[in-house]
């Protein structure tokens, strides 16, 4: 049974609102509580491998437990682990001696995996998650002697590693399951784990399993993955309709999201909009308002379905139907004109050109970020959590599109994120397409001409941008991100 739905109303509200930005000195003990402990990660996919690499580099003893069949077949998980010189063995050999077992298998495997793990885990050990779906949406009940914690980096596993190698980290939510903290050491374990992945350098929120799941599902379905996918497909089609070189069009979209969203990391929507010329800023602002009006009902529907549990229920039906919907959506995405275009445009597009020729892309980003944030806080999710799930994680997702378009994004995000992204995109595409196709040519692929500016109008627009609640909380949170590194942009 859905854990969230069985709670009384007041507890639901308290859990969904739980969010506290942790101070730097709360990590002064670093990862001492986990030093010389046996840590076993189950599953060596994107999150499993990249968290393990960071944790090993932070001085921890990490090994991988895989199913016997995976080891015999030498599947991708076995190859990932052995290629990176980790100890690998089956569940029966590693789990009984583990102090901390971290379950990083895909969400749809959790029910069966966790049942197996509980039979093998020693008394008073700890079970870790990086997404609370199994606990919150599936209602998994864990043995009472086991401490259950979560460390949820707010990005795909590949970016957990890349940011760590840059000397930084990714914003991270940590939580202790209220039903499973028998020795009251869950928070210390979660802090040490987050420290070991580098999360403390970017900012850590002490949250709850419920707040993480509900905000995570909303962010990934809408602005982070669903809207990026929808916008990529429609923007490419608009460029082709407006007679642009298909290869230039593909490059502008593929690398444009990464280049433009880099400004979000350093100065939020304000800086992103400031990178535009004044005529482009005014145009982007007005388009953004219209997009918000068009997409607002869809964002609210997704949030409502996430809170009620109906989204999870429908997705789990698809799991039991061999992922029929998900696999069909995946194949359909591969066949889109944007994905099929083979990038051959060899000329460099300057960083500023991505902004000058991407007024529409900036409009879409602004509207999606604000809508996701507003919808979450109107549901009771706290501003800090909504910020991480809407704005700060966005550049990290955009980086994946820059590597191999939507294919890369969809293979590195979680299975729940991929399903939710397709679900949103299927509904958003027809709603948004007619509006975007009706816009003038110079909002995408061309620069807007310099025209006379109404100073009062520009002043009011700047004030509205800078005083949006996401900009206020973002400015506060970014003060803690002193070690943030810029990525290589503009190809």
Swiss-Prot record:
Its EC number is 1.1.1.86. The keyword Metal-binding applies. PROSITE patterns: KARI_C (PS51851), KARI_N (PS51850). GO terms for molecular function: ketol-acid reductoisomerase activity; magnesium ion binding. One of its GO terms (cellular component) is cytosol. Residues 16-207 form the KARI N-terminal Rossmann domain. Coiled coil: none annotated. It is an enzyme of class 1 (oxidoreductase). The lineage of its organism: Bacteria, Pseudomonadati, Pseudomonadota, Gammaproteobacteria, Enterobacterales. Mg(2+) 2 binds at residues 216, 389, 393. It catalyses: (2R)-2,3-dihydroxy-3-methylbutanoate + NADP(+) = (2S)-2-acetolactate + NADPH + H(+); (2R,3R)-2,3-dihydroxy-3-methylpentanoate + NADP(+) = (S)-2-ethyl-2-hydroxy-3-oxobutanoate + NADPH + H(+). This is Ketol-acid reductoisomerase (NADP(+)). It comes from Buchnera aphidicola subsp. Schizaphis graminum (strain Sg). Belongs to the ketol-acid reductoisomerase family. Pathway: Amino-acid biosynthesis; L-isoleucine biosynthesis; L-isoleucine from 2-oxobutanoate: step 2/4; Amino-acid biosynthesis; L-valine biosynthesis; L-valine from pyruvate: step 2/4. Mg(2+) 1 binds at residues 216, 220. The active site is at residue 131. Signal peptide: none annotated. Involved in the biosynthesis of branched-chain amino acids (BCAA). Catalyzes an alkyl-migration followed by a ketol-acid reduction of (S)-2-acetolactate (S2AL) to yield (R)-2,3-dihydroxy-isovalerate. In the isomerase reaction, S2AL is rearranged via a Mg-dependent methyl migration to produce 3-hydroxy-3-methyl-2-ketobutyrate (HMKB). In the reductase reaction, this 2-ketoacid undergoes a metal-dependent reduction by NADPH to yield (R)-2,3-dihydroxy-isovalerate. Substrate binds at residue 414. NADP(+) binds at residues 44-47, 67, 77, 107-109, 157. Binds 2 magnesium ions per subunit. The gene is ilvC. GO terms for biological process: isoleucine biosynthetic process; L-valine biosynthetic process. Residues 208-344, 345-484 form the KARI C-terminal knotted domain. Pfam families: KARI_C (PF01450), KARI_N (PF07991). SUPFAM superfamilies: 6-phosphogluconate dehydrogenase C-terminal domain-like, NAD(P)-binding Rossmann-fold domains. Keywords: Amino-acid biosynthesis, Branched-chain amino acid biosynthesis, Magnesium, Metal-binding, NADP, Oxidoreductase, Repeat. Its cofactor is Mg(2+).
């Amino acid at each position: 049974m859905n854990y969230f739905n069985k709670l009384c109303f007041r507890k639901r509200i308290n859990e969904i609102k739980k969010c506290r930005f942790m101070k730097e000195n709360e990590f002064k003990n670093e990862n001492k509580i986990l030093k010389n402990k046996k840590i076993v990660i189950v599953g060596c996919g994107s999150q499993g491998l990249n968290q393990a690499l960071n944790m090993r580099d932070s001085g921890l003893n990490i090994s991988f437990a895989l199913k016997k069949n995976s080891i015999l077949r030498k599947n991708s998980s076995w190859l990932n682990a052995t290629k990176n010189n980790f100890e690998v063995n089956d569940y029966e050999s590693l789990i009984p001696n583990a102090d901390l077992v971290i379950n990083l298998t895909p969400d749809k495997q959790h029910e069966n995996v966790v049942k197996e793990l509980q039979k093998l885990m020693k008394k008073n050990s700890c079970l870790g998650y990086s997404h609370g779906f199994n606990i919150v949406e599936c209602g998994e009940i864990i043995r009472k002697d086991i401490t259950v914690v979560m460390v949820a980096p707010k990005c795909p596993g590949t970016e957990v590693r890349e940011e760590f190698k840059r000397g930084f980290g990714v914003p991270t939510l940590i939580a202790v399951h209220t039903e499973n903290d028998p020795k009251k050491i869950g928070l210390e374990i979660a802090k040490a784990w987050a420290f070991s992945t580098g999360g403390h350098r970017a900012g850590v929120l002490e949250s709850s399993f419920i707040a993480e799941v509900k905000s995570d599902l909303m962010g990934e379905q809408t602005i982070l993955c669903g809207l990026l996918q929808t916008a990529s497909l429609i923007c490419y089609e608009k460029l082709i309709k407006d007679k642009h070189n298909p290869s230039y069009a593909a490059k502008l979209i593929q690398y444009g999201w990464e280049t433009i969203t880099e400004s979000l990391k350093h100065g939020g929507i304000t800086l992103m909009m400031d990178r535009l010329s004044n005529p482009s800023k005014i145009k982007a602002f007005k388009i953004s308002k219209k997009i918000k009006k068009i997409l607002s009902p869809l964002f609210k529907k997704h949030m409502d379905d996430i809170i009620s549990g109906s989204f999870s229920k429908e997705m789990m039906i698809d799991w039991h139907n061999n992922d029929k919907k998900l696999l069909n959506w995946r194949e359909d995405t591969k066949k889109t004109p944007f994905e099929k275009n083979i990038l051959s445009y060899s000329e460099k597009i300057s960083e500023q050109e991505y902004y000058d020729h991407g007024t529409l892309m900036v409009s879409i980003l602004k509207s999606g970020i604000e809508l996701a944030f507003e919808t979450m806080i109107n549901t009771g999710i706290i501003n800090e959590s909504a910020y991480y799930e809407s704005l700060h994680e966005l550049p990290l997702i955009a980086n994946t599109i820059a590597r191999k378009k939507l294919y890369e994004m969809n293979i590195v995000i979680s299975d729940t994120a991929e399903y939710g992204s397709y679900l949103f995109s299927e509904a958003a595409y027809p709603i948004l397409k007619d509006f975007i196709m009706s816009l003038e040519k110079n909002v995408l692929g061309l620069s807007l001409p310099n025209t006379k500016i109404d100073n009062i109008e520009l002043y009011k627009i700047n004030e509205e941008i800078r005083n949006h609640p996401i900009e206020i909380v973002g400015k506060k949170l970014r003060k803690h991100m002193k070690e943030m590194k810029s990525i290589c942009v503009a190809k």
